[in-house]
Amino acid sequence: MTEFDPEKFEDKYKHYFPQLQRAYKAAFETMNDQYDSELAHAIDQQVLSESEPFYEGDGEFRIELPENPRERLSGVLVNQERFETVLERYVEELESELQAVFGFQ
């Protein structure tokens, strides 16, 4: 567990890059085990790779997604409802992993 400093999180890629990688990897592994691996991989590589984590305070994180995440997805057939459901669950998992990595859980 890493000691968390909200001010350092403003420059997260300088101060917390390994921890961010660990959280994203753990979230991917969970999603890959629970959902279609092609869809999980596509969301990871084509949507979440362009996402931005933010610390909201009180141990809470928020993931800002790129614009039009569904339009970024290619190479996998999925309807809009399924995509939104899996993406929402993936974001929840990622936020939870960030909380765990930084000792809020």
PLM feature spans:
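Acidic, polar-rich N-terminal leader regions of halophilic archaeal proteins
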Residues: 1-105
